[in-house]
Each structure stands twice: as structure tokens, then as C-alpha cells.
Amino acid sequence: MNYFNVGKIVNTQGLQGEMRVLSVTDFAEERFKKGAKLALFDDKDQFAMEVEIASHRKAKNFDIIKFKGMYHINDIEKYKGFSLKIAEENLTDLEDGEFYYHEIIGLDVYENDILIGQIKEILQPGANDVWVVKRKGKKDLLLPYIPPVVLNIDIPNNRVDVELLEGLDDEN
């Protein structure tokens, strides 16, 4: 079964079994809602156990969650540093034109039918995502995910068509 990261437990919060989670999902309200089922993976990325969310709230830069059946700091302290993941079967369908990161990473990038490289990572620096494109013999290309640049995403054919605006590729 495939699992996808939604957050990392970075610390405990108080004495009542709450944990601070650094979220890496665009769907935190859905992923951490009461009753949601997630999987815990240890610091070696080994499956540890399935958990159910008992409560969730936002606080500053963190999501504060509590697991069902774990209501004291002693129950959860051992999970600091663990990752929270969602099973692929529990992913929700997205609207047309929306994609999960795992669908984008690995796609081939083309400009005018010429292969530029392959998407290896997605950064979230601010207003829009930035795709990191690995290229042969050149340094990585940082490609903003904006309509004038990304023209077409074709998941079944493992392809993204782009138009590199002036200044995006400083090696040409």
C-alpha cells in the first residue's frame, strides 16, 4: 500500500495528549479532522501503527492534534519525530486541473516538444508553487507553477508542456 506524507510530529503540546504537527498538506482541515484515519511512520520511515484523530485545531504555524485513545503526554511522547501519512485509498478526488504532488513529481517537462528535464521536487515559497526541474548537464531549473509558464499537464502521458518566460532559464 502506498502512503503519502501529510505532516510530522515535532513536539508535544501540554499534558493532555496533544501534539504539534508541522503540516505538509494543502488539506490540513480534512486530513486532521476528527475521525480521520492516518498512519504513523517512525524516523526510519517504517510503518508503526494506524491512528484516528480525536481533535484538531490550528495554533500559530502548527496543527495541534490528539489521537483517539491517547489522552496523556506519556501516551504520545514517544511519537515525536514520527511522520503522519495518509493511505492512497483515503485520498480524495480533486477538481479538474488540481493535482497531488506525487502525480507531478517525476513528470517530463517539454518546451516546444523538446525535453527540458524531469520534475524532481515541489517547493512552496509563497504565492505559488515552484517546480524543481532536473536537467542533464545543467543546474536545476526553478519553474513557477503559473498559467503563462505551465501550459498543459498530461498525467497519463507523463508530460508537462511549458513556455519558459524570459529570465527563467539563466543558462541560455
Swiss-Prot record:
<dbReference type="InterPro" id="IPR036976">
    <property type="entry name" value="RimM_N_sf"/>
</dbReference>
<comment type="subunit">
    <text>Binds ribosomal protein uS19.</text>
</comment>
<protein>
    <recommendedName>
        <fullName>Ribosome maturation factor RimM</fullName>
    </recommendedName>
</protein>
<keyword id="KW-0690">Ribosome biogenesis</keyword>
<dbReference type="InterPro" id="IPR011961">
    <property type="entry name" value="RimM"/>
</dbReference>
<dbReference type="GO" id="GO:0042274">
    <property type="term" value="P:ribosomal small subunit biogenesis"/>
</dbReference>
<comment type="similarity">
    <text>Belongs to the RimM family.</text>
</comment>
<dbReference type="GO" id="GO:0005737">
    <property type="term" value="C:cytoplasm"/>
</dbReference>
<keyword id="KW-0143">Chaperone</keyword>
<dbReference type="GO" id="GO:0043022">
    <property type="term" value="F:ribosome binding"/>
</dbReference>
<dbReference type="InterPro" id="IPR027275">
    <property type="entry name" value="PRC-brl_dom"/>
</dbReference>
<dbReference type="Pfam" id="PF05239">
    <property type="entry name" value="PRC"/>
</dbReference>
<feature type="domain" description="PRC barrel">
    <location>
        <begin position="96"/>
        <end position="168"/>
    </location>
</feature>
<comment type="function">
    <text>An accessory protein needed during the final step in the assembly of 30S ribosomal subunit, possibly for assembly of the head region. Essential for efficient processing of 16S rRNA. May be needed both before and after RbfA during the maturation of 16S rRNA. It has affinity for free ribosomal 30S subunits but not for 70S ribosomes.</text>
</comment>
<dbReference type="GO" id="GO:0005840">
    <property type="term" value="C:ribosome"/>
</dbReference>
<keyword id="KW-0963">Cytoplasm</keyword>
<keyword id="KW-0698">rRNA processing</keyword>
<dbReference type="GO" id="GO:0006364">
    <property type="term" value="P:rRNA processing"/>
</dbReference>
<dbReference type="InterPro" id="IPR002676">
    <property type="entry name" value="RimM_N"/>
</dbReference>
<dbReference type="InterPro" id="IPR009000">
    <property type="entry name" value="Transl_B-barrel_sf"/>
</dbReference>
<dbReference type="InterPro" id="IPR011033">
    <property type="entry name" value="PRC_barrel-like_sf"/>
</dbReference>
<dbReference type="Pfam" id="PF01782">
    <property type="entry name" value="RimM"/>
</dbReference>
